[in-house]
């Protein structure tokens, strides 16, 4: 793990009021390394510069923390929440949220099986628990009783326009979620 990586990550997280442990920083760094390596053979992300990955992928994925008080969410570990990341792609925002908030139960949903395979590699390499990568389409899984109305939180990035995204996400959120 480089000093530059730690400095940039600490700075971005501090702006959000998040303090990461050394283990969490190591997990973010390993995730970064895996993203860069896999991106050589699979188009996971266009942004690959260290500072941009930290700012535009990792820290941006954690912006939920700013809305948490408004939504009545306590992400300090004092309450358990389930979260589905629809169209997760390379794991954003689901994996950064899981690293920063280990008590979160996360489902990563993506329509491409090869990305789901990569996400499973990341989950194993980082030693993450209570996180599952699922291959499927939101419009199908939103009708499946196993997933429909099962989550407190639904997150997504760069999937569709807001009206379409709402149609994808709302079926996953339980009443009061």
Question: What is each model feature region?
Answer:
Residues 1-78, 84, 121-131:
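Class I SAM-dependent transferase core
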Residues 19, 43-46, 52-53, 58, ...:
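Residue-level preference for alpha-helix termini and adjacent loops
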Residues 29, 55, 59, 117, ...:
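Solvent-exposed, non-transmembrane amphipathic alpha-helical segments
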Residues 62-160, 164-167:
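Conserved SAM/SAH cofactor-binding pocket of Class I
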Residues 104, 176-177:
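A short helix->loop->beta-strand "cap" motif at the edges of active sites that frequently abuts
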Residues 164-176:
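A short glycine-rich, Lys/Arg-flanked "PGG" loop and its adjoining helix->strand segment in the class I
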């Amino acid at each position: 793990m480089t000093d530059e990586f730690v400095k940039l990550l600490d700075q971005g997280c501090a702006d959000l009021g998040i303090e990461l442990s050394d283990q969490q920083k190591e997990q973010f760094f390993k995730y970064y390394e895996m993203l860069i390596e896999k991106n050589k053979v699979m188009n996971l992300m266009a942004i690959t510069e260290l500072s941009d990955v930290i700012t535009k992928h990792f820290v941006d994925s954690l912006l939920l923390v700013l809305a948490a008080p408004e939504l009545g969410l306590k992400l300090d570990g004092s309450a358990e929440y389930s979260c589905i990341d629809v169209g997760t792609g390379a794991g954003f925002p689901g994996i950064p949220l899981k690293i920063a908030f280990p008590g979160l139960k996360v489902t990563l949903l993506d329509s491409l099986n090869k990305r789901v395979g990569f996400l499973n590699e990341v989950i194993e390499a980082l030693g993450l628990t209570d996180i599952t990568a699922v291959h499927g389409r939101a419009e199908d899984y939103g009708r499946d009783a196993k997933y429909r109305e099962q989550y407190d939180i639904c997150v997504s990035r760069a999937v569709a326009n807001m009206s379409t995204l709402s149609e994808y996400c709302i079926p996953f959120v339980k009443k009061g979620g």
